[in-house]
Amino acid sequence: MGKLLLILGSAIALPSFAAAGGDLDISDTVGVSFWLVTAGMLAATVFFFVERDQVSAKWKTSLTVSGLITGIAFWHYLYMRGVWIDTGDTPTVFRYIDWLLTVPLQVVEFYLILAACTSVAASLFKKLLAGSLVMLGAGFAGEAGLAPVLPAFIIGMAGWLYMIYELYMGEGKAAVSTASPAVNSAYNAMMMIIVVGWAIYPAGYAAGYLMGGEGVYASNLNLIYNLADFVNKILFGLIIWNVAVKESSNA
């Protein structure tokens, strides 16, 4: 029943949003990327909630969180794509509201995947959450004009690097060392997303605000951000799903 309501709710919501924003120009690469990411987030959300019933109890919460991440992103992309198609402006507020919800949930995923198979201190979650909030707060301040662009960029990078340190060298490394091979593999893959996939975001910030002239930054910024969200949110969830299926089959 829950899955049916999810699908029906999405089907009801889509027509009204699809009608908004006018027609999509074939030459509007950024607009096309908004539509592709919107569709991808919806498909991933349905997939994660359907697959939740196929894994053992200790992995259900992880798949639920994966579905929440893509579901929240789907909802915000419905609005963001409309802002872009109607105005050509960057939907900064919508995007950061989305990130303020989904990035901490990705932090939760790291904690959950470790807690499912080994002992992990709650302090790891608190440290990762603090790093993510510094990263997001500084990024928003720079993009919204509340702080100088370059200092905000540096502070945001510091928050991101702190998270990487904790996962690679700190409590994350200590916790995963006692986990199963499947969890180790998933953890390393998730780390690659944090290191390589999340690097797309500062690249977009730099392309939008630190390089290029007035009037060109919006296209650079949104195309890169859309690509990053597509890869980081959906692939992140698929890694969780993969390890959940493997661990459940071995149980």
Curated annotation (Swiss-Prot):
It comes from Gamma-proteobacterium Hot 75m4. One of its GO terms (cellular component) is plasma membrane. Changing residue 109 to Q: Changes in the photocycle. Gene3D superfamilies: Rhodopsin 7-helix transmembrane proteins. GO terms for molecular function: light-activated monoatomic ion channel activity; photoreceptor activity. The keyword Chaperone does not apply. The record marks 106 as: Responsible for spectral tuning. The modification N6-(retinylidene)lysine is found at residue 233. Presents a much slower photocycle than that of the green-absorbing proteorhodopsin, probably an adaptation to the intensity of solar illumination at a depth of 75m, where this bacterium was collected. Transport occurs only at pHs above 7 and is unidirectional. This is Blue-light absorbing proteorhodopsin. The record marks 109 as: Primary proton donor. Keywords: Cell membrane, Chromophore, Hydrogen ion transport, Ion transport, Membrane, Photoreceptor protein, Receptor, Retinal protein, Sensory transduction, Signal, Transmembrane, Transmembrane helix, Transport. The record marks 98 as: Primary proton acceptor. The keyword Transmembrane applies. It holds the Pfam family Bac_rhodopsin.
